A protein has these predicted regions:
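E1/E1-like adenylate-forming module used to activate ubiquitin-like modifiers
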Residues: 1-80, 110-111, 115-120
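A short, charged, Gly/Pro-tolerant segment at domain boundaries
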Residues: 94-119
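Oxidoreductase and adenylate-handling cofactor-binding alpha/beta cores
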Residues: 11, 83-97
């Protein structure tokens, strides 16, 4: 989901000092198989600069040109994205140890890689 409504929600959360996590999923079809990236972006009072400086959250309106927008629903990828977001949320509140304190994480499907960035 994108667009102006999402921008307003994010701006209000930032204004009120509320931490939040935004997730995204992009997939593409290539040679009869899907590839793509899952994204988990965390915003806290201590670290919000990466939201603007690195455009970590998309506010674009979906144009329907990517394969995910064409109603490809991949339950396992949606579940993984949600699980990674919940794990990060629990790290924020001390339930899990957080050595890297990353505020951005990307999972690439084809390489099975987790990449962390935007550490405190």
């Amino acid at each position: 989901d994108g667009g102006e409504a999402k921008r307003l929600i994010v701006e209000k959360l930032v204004e009120l000092g509320i931490p939040f996590i935004d997730v995204g999923l992009g997939v593409e079809l290539d040679n009869e198989s899907l590839g793509g990236i899952l994204r988990i972006t965390t915003s806290t009072v201590e670290n919000r600069e990466h939201l603007r400086s690195k455009d970590r959250i998309s506010f674009s309106v979906e144009n329907g040109n990517d394969d995910y927008s064409k109603n490809i629903q991949i339950a396992d990828l949606n579940a993984l994205n949600a699980a990674l977001a919940v794990i990060k949320w629990k790290k924020l509140f001390g339930f899990y140890r957080d050595l890297e304190k990353e505020n951005f994480c990307a999972y690439t499907i084809d390489g099975n890689s987790l990449i962390n960035d935007d550490q405190l």
